[in-house]
Each structure stands twice: as C-alpha cells, then as structure tokens.
Amino acid sequence: MAKVWSKRFDNALDPFIEKFNASIGFDKKLILEDLDCSIAHAKMLGKTKVLSPSETLQIINGLESIKVEYLEGKFSPSLPSEDIHYCIEHKLISLIGETGKKLHTGRSRNDQVGTDIRLWLRKEIDNIEILIADLQKSFLNLAKANIYTLIPGYTHMQRAQPLSLAHHLLAYIEMLQRDRERFKEVRGRVNISPLGAAALAGTKIKIDRHFTAAELGFEKIYKNSIDAVSDRDFCIEFVSTSALLMSHLSKISEEIILWVTDEFSFAKLTDKCATGSSLMPQKKNPDVPELIRGKTGRVYGHLQALLTMVKGVPLSYNKDFQEDKEPIFDTAETISSCITAMTILLNEGIEFNIQNLSDSVENDFSNATDLADYLVSKDVPFRTAYQVVGEIVKYCLKRKMLFKNLKIDEFKKFHPEFDEDVFVDLKPFNVVKSRNSEGGTGFAQVEKEVKNWQKKLSI
C-alpha cells in the first residue's frame, strides 16, 4: 500500500522503520471515533458547499458501511496501513472511488487525531464516573450495616482512638467523591474541539468549525490552531487524576490486606475473591487488593511517561505525541478494572469479624484522650489533664493493666476530680458515641452522613 505522502520521496521506507513508525497496532482502538469524526467533517464540507450533495452522501454512506463492516467483524485495521486515519481513508477510496479522496479536504491528521482521542476519552471518563459511583454505593451499603460496629482508629499505624466502622468507610466515599469531581473537571477540558485547526495554521478552505464541534458534542472549539494540535494537557490531567484515584484504591487495598491477616483478623475474604497457594494448603491469599495495589505503580508510570513526552517539545505537533495513546488507553483499562474488582470485593468478597473488632477496642489505651476529656469536663485544663493521663498510662503499662482494671482509688491518686462515672465515659461504645462534633465519629453524626450520601447517590 502506497503511503499518502509517498510521492514526495524517491525511495521506499525501510521495512523496519515502517513498522517502527506505524501506530495502527494501537490507534485502531480509535476506529469508531475516527469514523464519527470523518462523518461530521464530511457533513460540514457538504454544508459549506466544498462537497456537492451527492459527494457528501456518497462519502457518508461509505463511512457508515465501513462502520457496519467493523462492527460485524468483517473489517480489521492492520498493517500496511500506517495509522487508523489512513486505513479508513484507503478503505473508503476502495469502496467509493475518487470521491473518497476529497474527505481529507480542510483537515490534517494532526487535528484529526486530537479529535479522535478527545471523543474516546470523553466516553471513557463518563464510564469511569459511573463505576466510581457504583463503588461509592458499595462502601455506603457496608457503612449502613456497620454504624454501631467499632474499629480501632490508627495514626502512625499505632492505635489512636476507637471509631465507628461506618465512619471509616465513609472516609473512602469522600475520597472517591473528590475523584469523581476531578474527572468531571478533566472532562470539561477534554470536551473542546481541535477539528479544523488542520496541521497547525488553520486552512483556507471554507469550513465551519462550530458545526463539526456541535455534531460531535463538543462544548466549544480551540481558539488557537497551534495550541489545538499541540495540546496534550488533557491526557496528562486524565492520567494524573487516575493516579490519584489509584492511590485511594491502593490505600483501601492495603487496609483490607492488613485486616484479613491473622495478626489483625478484623475481616476475612470469601472464596469468591481469594485464591490459594500452590504449596501451602492453609493459605487464602488477598490477590484482588494486592493486584490493585500493584497496578497503582503502572498508572504512576504512565503519568511519568506523558510528562516526559511533552517536556521540552517545541510547538506545534511532533511525532512524540504518538506516544500519548498507549498510556491513556492502558490507564483507562487499568482503573476501570480496578474499580470494578474493588466493587465486587466489597459486595461479595469481604466479611467483617464483628467480635474481634469489638474485642480489639476493649483491650488498649485508645480511650486515653477520653480520660483526659473527662478531667476537662471537671474544669481541669487540657494540658494538665493530658499529663495526668500520660502518668496513668505509664502506671498501667508497668503493671500490665488497662484503665478498666484500675480501682477508683488508684485514679484519685493521680487527680482528685476522678469519680465513679469515669468508668462509664471510658467504655468504647460511649467513647465513640460522645464524639458528635460535625464530621466526627459519633453515631448520630455517622447516621446523618449515611442519610446524606444515600440522597447524593440516589440509593
């Protein structure tokens, strides 16, 4: 197959360089977007009378036929086509003849590929937003069922304060909501049409860029043709936002991996979301969260690749930009599969060990802050109360005791304001219940937030 640009050259391209230069192996993923882009372009050329009505209809029908052939599995883009754009153009010419050669009037592959990527990415972002919302709903269902389930809260991976398990789960819903908002913001910058910018300087052909933008569902057009063909910010923003999402999924995964260990034993995995060992018959491995955690680095790598790709590249379009597609293709596939896997894991792959969770908050000093708050309620300055409780913790550790094992007389040795009601305040359930500041882990606050999220997520 002759290259579209071959008449400029005396000799054929080296076979290895031909393969090295080609992008058809991966940009064929854009075939439907490229067909839609070309149909919109043909309609516009007809509207502006660059094409006659019969030529316009012939080209559109030809492109629609190619789409049908592809969807029916009768047409598969491949070498020797250099890229998806020329592949479709060549196919169109073979179907309708010389008229097909008029399709590329007033555009370049530079603005064409930018349009295709944006159409593809816009659709992916819409799907990802739905997947994240489904994951939020899974977290919310677990939270709703565990408002009164207690779990140790950690700072520095040390026991800190007892929490409602629902409060802990709601924290992930908040993170995921920020991810959804970021994707929506990225979509807004994706949804700008570069079509009609041509190679870099626009075109003298009579075109209507606003018409093609409207046909393809874009909100507006690029106002600078150079920027239109050279902008890859939106690719970087998409992968950057995806990297942040993956950091959240990795955080969730790490906690699940810890929770299902014998050392924590806060939860267990069901058979639907765990695997075994080829050697050790007792093993039940958390492969799903481990894979999600591992795939996070993959997305981080794509972000670094894109940032490096655009670094120091002069205006306007450069062949470097061929390297933008595989990172965004793989990122979209990776995050979609990870979100789906995590949703399945939460829905049917994890069971909390309620008794172990309850026991865990009964046998530590995570109620130490509440002991200090008790003294504060007796008009003792907080810093004084803090120091008193520090002394009590040290006293208990030396004797291998907990607060609940002390007698009231022992408490009074440290401060006279202690009374019998201190034991009520120290019960983990009451500790959690009392933290009713807005956004806190108190049951009333958690119930309120569960209801708020039910409204937001329409469940």
Swiss-Prot record:
Pathway: Amino-acid biosynthesis; L-arginine biosynthesis; L-arginine from L-ornithine and carbamoyl phosphate: step 3/3
Localisation per UniProt entry: Cytoplasm
Enzyme category, top tier: lyase
InterPro entries given in the database record: Arg_succ_lyase_C (IPR029419), Argininosuccinate_lyase (IPR009049), Fumarase/histidase_N (IPR024083), Fumarate_lyase_CS (IPR020557), Fumarate_lyase_fam (IPR000362), Fumarate_lyase_N (IPR022761), L-Aspartase-like (IPR008948)
Keyword Ion transport belongs to the record: no
GO cellular component, one term: cytosol
EC nos: 4.3.2.1
One term of GO molecular function: argininosuccinate lyase activity
GO biological process per UniProt: arginine biosynthetic process via ornithine; L-arginine biosynthetic process
Keywords: Amino-acid biosynthesis, Arginine biosynthesis, Cytoplasm, Lyase
Catalytic activity: 2-(N(omega)-L-arginino)succinate = fumarate + L-arginine
Statement: the UniProt record of this protein carries the keyword Protein biosynthesis: no
Location (main, coarse): cytoplasm
Family of this protein: Belongs to the lyase 1 family. Argininosuccinate lyase subfamily.
PANTHER family referenced in this protein's UniProt entry, alphabetically: ARGININOSUCCINATE LYASE
Protein's name in the database: Argininosuccinate lyase
Organism expressing this protein natively: Prochlorococcus marinus (strain MIT 9301)
